[in-house]
Amino acid sequence: DVALESPFNKGLRYGGASISVDNLELYIAAQNPTAAFPENIDLFMTQYEVLDRDDDGNYLYLWGALKPLENLNSASGWEAQPALSSDGKQLYFASVNEQSLVDASGNRTMDIWMSERTEDGDWGPAELLPRPINSTSNDKAPFLHPDGNTLYFSSDRSPSGGGYDIWYCHRDSTGRWEDAKNLGAPINTDGDEHGLVVSTDGEEAFFASRRTGTKGLDLLRFPVPEEFKPEEVRIVKGTLQATDGGIPPGAKLYLQYAKSKRIETIEINEDDGRFASIVRLDQGEDVLLISEAEGLAFQASVVVDIEQTPPNSDALVAPIVLQQPLNGEAFEIGDIQYASNSAEIGRTSIIILEAFASYLTRNEALGVHIIGHTDDVGAERENQVLSERRALAVATALANYGVPVARITSQGLGESYPLAPNIDATSRSINRRTEFEITLKN
């Protein structure tokens, strides 16, 4: 284990850290003594800031100063155990304050609260989560899974095996929290269990427990039972930049669910172009990652293909580089694929072309010239014809999705303009491509 350096661990008590899905924002609880309340614990946040770039162009980072969450901290209360939602818009935490619920003896209990991020990036007033999450017992240590709808927390309410137990609560499609469920034995015991976190793929959980056989408070793990699993999600992450290596001003990045056309905007870090987002897999839809910027080329790729079993690992997207399409240079849109030795466009490629057609119809001054290329496998004349048929198939698809035919042209260049020597399967895959040239129409 390595202790974090400044601004952490500067002599006071720290704990309960929660980090954003892009790893650039961290929330933590720390002792913040006041004259009236020396043991006061408050919530703080810090950002992972770009300090400089080295000689190779790599970014150097540093955690910024801890900033107290003034709207959430109370002078005479206790705020700790933060849990940031995967979209960065909600912050859950535990607190004992003047508005807390009271038990049968009239004592204030530990409760779970939630704050919404405002448009200016600050945190709004905290709200006490409703029953069945909070009770007149002590409820603490919230963990909201990246699916955004599954909350795990610790409580000493009944029924209980004794001490604090881990509980599960799911939010339905209407936003209502369903009945909370105790995870039961052997996860919960007559000791204390709390601090549970669940992996993004929902398969494994980690928690702290003080039970028979442990040496005090120890860390344990277990496979998540089916009835307590969160919804299926994956993390999509990468970087976006222009060809000059800078961050395109006004660049837009979003997820589009192919069937419902639902759009989810992804925030791009202005310093280094990094991004990360959660993609829902339970919708039964293909999902596109689309990037646009004024004056720069459209790009899209399929990050969820419903005909393939989603991998458990995160989806690390190759760096997105937006080219300048109006300087006479051709550009590629990733994942435009065809059946072998055919002009039949692949299923997911059709989805990408539909999104590209939408982009062109929104930008009426733009035309597009489509260029087909092949590798050198087969006869040169056959490759020439195949490239023409593939380019025409793409042109037809764009027209079918509403782009006026007058704004579309196409040609095939066969194997005449390879990007790499045709020496192996990898180089040939580079040469089999469809390029696009954007033109300005009068």
Regions found by a protein language model. Give the residues of each.
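Loop/turn elements at helix/coil->beta-strand transitions in domains of secreted/extracellular proteins
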Residues: 24, 89, 149, 363-367, ...
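Short, conserved micro-motifs composed of acidic
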Residues: 1-239, 243-249, 265, 269, ...
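Periplasmic OmpA-like peptidoglycan-binding domain that tethers envelope proteins to the cell wall
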Residues: 155, 160, 371-442
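Extracytoplasmic
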Residues: 21, 109, 333, 365, ...
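Structural recognition of the beta-strand scaffold that forms the well-ordered cores
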Residues: 83, 197, 337, 344, ...
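Periplasmic peptidoglycan-binding/tethering modules of Gram-negative envelope proteins
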Residues: 227-367, 440-442
